[in-house]
Every structure is written in structure tokens, then in C-alpha cells.
Amino acid sequence: MISVYERESDQAAGEEEYFRLPLPKRNQHEMFAIADRLSGGSRMTVICEDGKSRMARIPGKMKRKQRVRAGDLLIIKPWDIQNEKSDIVFRYKRTQASALSRRKLLPEAIDVF
């Protein structure tokens, strides 16, 4: 698992916290994407870092654990056969997405945080 460590200092206590955030595995063709709109039936339209708009499928294990909404930062994996479709691998929370944006790890095309 490729990850990045984020250090944030607590001004009052003087303590530092580390967050471990997964990054897309480029060798497995994963990439960042922003959820654009929900289509129903556990599918949504996403805007990828390469500028393409793809139909993304929310897998059952993610559908039961956490809700994906429009505007969320995601890691997706395009299908091998149909490149215009993809699977959602991971959803970042708002604080995690802003931490990636502060560290300049998001591509310019989707850095809206």
C-alpha cells in the first residue's frame, strides 16, 4: 500500500499527529477522480484526473460501509475492456482530501480542495 504521512500540530498541546493516507497505485492503473453526479443503481459519473468523464460503479463492500456523495475525492480503477467505465476503490473524507491538497499531491485538474 502506497501511503503518505501527514503531520498536523496541535497548537494548545504541542503534540503532533500523523495520518496515513492511501494514494492511487499507478502500476494498477488507479487514478484520482471527483464524484460529479449520482446516476442511481450504485453508479455515478466521475471526472478523472486525465480529463475524461467515466461511469463509476460503487462496489457492495463500500456501499454498505460509507456513502459516496457528489463532490467527494475518490480513487478509481478504469475497466480493462471498457475504458469509459470504472470501479471506485477508495473514498477520501473531506479532511483527508484537504490534507492531500495542502501537500500538493492532487493533480491540477481536480484540485478543488
Predicted ranges, named:
Residues 2-31:
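Short boundary/loop segments of OB/S1/cold-shock single-stranded nucleic-acid-binding domains
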Residues 34-35, 88:
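Conserved hydrophobic positions within beta-strands
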Residues 38-39, 92:
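A generic structural motif
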Residues 41-46:
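Short aromatic-glycine-enriched beta-strand elements
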Residues 50-60:
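Short, structured beta-strand/loop micro-motifs enriched in basic residues and often containing a Trp
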Residues 62-75:
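Short nucleic-acid-contacting surface segments enriched for D/E, G, S/T with interspersed K/R
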Residues 77-84, 94:
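Short, charged beta-turn/beta-strand-edge "cap" motif at the junction between a beta-strand
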Residues 91-113:
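Short peripheral tails and domain-boundary helices/loops at the edges of structured domains
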